[in-house]
Amino acid sequence: LGQQVGGNLFHSFGQFSIDTGESATFSGPNSVNNIIGRVTGGEASFIDGTIRSTIPGANLYLLNPAGLLFGENATLDVSGSVHVSTADYLRLGDGGRFDAHTPGNSVLTVAPVVAFGFLDPPAPITVNGGFLRVPDGQTLSLIGGDITLHNATLYAPAGRIDLVTVGSAGEVLPTDHDLVMQGFGTLGALTIERDPVVARVTVDIGEPLGEIPLGDLDTSGEGGGAIFIRGGQWVNRGGWVFTNTYGARAGR
C-alpha cells in the first residue's frame, strides 16, 4: 500500500521486475501527486511488461541504484510524468530524502523531489526495443549512468524528454527550463542506435504524424516539446532526435 506523506506516496521493494505480459499497478487516493518507488535489494530491474498507475495525474518516480533494463514489450500507462533513475537517493524539499542505497537515512516529507543523488559508480539504464510514451505535455526522464537506447523510442508529445548520464558522485537538479549538474567529476555516455531494418509503429496524437521509427527521441505534438541531454559522450548510430509543432500552440 505504501506510505503517504502529504501528496507523496512512497513505496519500497526488495526486488522489482515485470515479466513479459505482466504489469505492476500503483494505486492510491486522488490526493497523491507523486508516486515514489525505490528498489533496495541490489539487483537490477528488468521491465518487459506494463508499469501502470490508476491515480489521475500522479507522477511516477522509479529508483534502482543497481540498474534498469526495459525490454521490447515494456510500456507505460501513467497519466503524469515518469522519471526512472539509477540514483542512490532522491532529495526532497524541506530537508527530505528517500534513500535506496541506505534506506535508514530516509527522511520523508510532503515536499516534491528536487534532486537525483548519485554515489560512485552509477549503474546503467538500457531500453532495448521498447516504446516508452507519456501523455501530452508530460515529462519522460532517464537519469543514470551510461544510457543505451537500442531500437527504442521515447515519446513525449508536446512534452519534455530528459536524458542524463553521469559517471561519478553528484546531484542532478531538474528545473522548469534546464538540468543543473552539481559535483560530478565525470559524466557518462548516451548511445542511441537503430538497426538498418526495424519495425515501425504508428501513433495517433490527433494530428497527422505518420509512422515513428524505433530508435528516436520525439516530443512533437500540438505544441513543440523540449529535449534536454546531459552527458560526457553521445553516440548516435542511425537514430533521430526531433521536435515539431503540428498545432497552433507555441513550441519550447
Explain the meaning of each model-derived region.
Residues 1-252:
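Extracellular and secretory-pathway beta-repeat/beta-biased strand scaffolds
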